[in-house]
A protein has these predicted regions:
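HDAC/HDAC-like amidohydrolase catalytic core signature
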Residues: 1-125
Length: 125
């Protein structure tokens, strides 16, 4: 079996073309993996959003609620480094769900890759 590749179209959040973070790289990566026949219908897995209870293993209830309800303060948004819009919230939850799925598939298959890796902008609170 080919290495499981976890990917979701929502990994490319709508943060604006002028944002310094190259968010489009996540869409380009899956295109390249397909072009090189590394990823295909048989080994691409689409994650679901991570559950709130899973998030609460690491983050405070207040922080998760603020992210989920798009209600961070302007200082908290600045610290996060991304605009707080639904596509960013969705991407965060789906990417984390992708990490959970990759972990489960790696246990079963010895290896798995989440194409949303490298987005370390979360805080416990």
């Amino acid at each position: 079996m080919n290495v499981p590749i976890i990917n979701h179209p929502d990994y490319v959040a709508q943060i604006g073309d002028d944002h310094r973070f190259p968010i489009k790289k996540f869409g380009e990566l899956i295109k390249l993996l397909k072009l090189k026949n590394i990823a295909g219908n048989d080994n691409i897995f689409k994650p679901m959003e991570v559950s709130i209870p899973t998030l609460l293993n690491t983050h405070t209830e207040d922080y998760v609620s603020k992210i989920n309800n798009l209600s961070l303060s302007s200082d908290e948004i600045r610290k996060l480094g991304f605009p707080l819009v639904e596509s960013v919230r969705r991407r965060s939850f789906v990417a984390t769900g992708g990490t959970v799925l990759a972990s489960k598939l790696a246990v079963k298959n010895k290896l798995a890759c989440n194409t949303a890796g490298g987005s370390h902008h979360a805080f416990s609170d």
